[in-house]
Amino acid sequence: MKKEILEWIISIAVAFVILFIVGKFIVTPYTIKGESMDPTLKDGERVAVNIVGYKTGGLEKGNVVVFHANKNDDYVKRVIGVPGDKVEYKNDTLYVNGKKQDEPYLNYNLKHKQGDYITGTFQVKDLPNANPKSNVIPKGKYLVLGDNREVSKDSRAFGLIDEDQIVGKVSFRFWPFSEFKHNFNPENTKN
């Protein structure tokens, strides 16, 4: 009987160590701050950020990521353009490599916009710190925008982000539990 109890205690201890390692080195929690991703992610909601998997699988357009905006702040935004993409917005319409792209995650904000446009018109070369002679996103850089474009501070304000600024990809929202969601890619976004 004592041996069985000891085995249970060891099993539970090992499970806690594994959970700690997974929590510390593979997935980390993040609390949404602000309204820049509303209604996809709202202020105060909690998400799990995969800090390893995106490095092996790569980032794709439409992924939602957390990144270091500066020494003190992390932001959460959607990847709009990846290295090698030619990105352009014309009157709220996204074109990547010359092809019009759907952005279903903007439906709510387009219906409730305050002005004429929520994204406007710009090209990669118009962004801060960009090469004024090229509309192509360079290697190691990403264009990120918030889903709530009218209030979001994103690549339009600070330019392309470096790959090494990225903390990880949002895997799922776990709080509030009633709003649990595990995939934020465009084809799975309805609002």
UniProtKB/Swiss-Prot annotation:
Topological domains, Extracellular: 29-191
Domain of life: Bacteria
Record-annotated membrane-spanning stretches: 8-28
Reaction it catalyzes: Cleavage of hydrophobic, N-terminal signal or leader sequences from secreted and periplasmic proteins
EC nos: 3.4.21.89
Location in the cell: Cell membrane
GO molecular function, a single term: serine-type endopeptidase activity
One GO CC annotation: plasma membrane
Keywords: Cell membrane, Hydrolase, Membrane, Protease, Transmembrane, Transmembrane helix
UniProt topological domain (Cytoplasmic) ranges: 1-7
Membrane topology: Single-pass type II membrane protein
Active site: 36, 77
PROSITE patterns per the UniProt record, alphabetical: SPASE_I_1, SPASE_I_2, SPASE_I_3
Swiss-Prot/TrEMBL GO biological process terms: signal peptide processing
Keyword Hydrolase recorded: yes
SUPFAM superfamilies: LexA/Signal peptidase
Recorded family membership: Belongs to the peptidase S26 family.
Function summary: Essential for cell viability.
NCBIfam families: sigpep_I_bact (TIGR02227)
Protein name: Signal peptidase IB
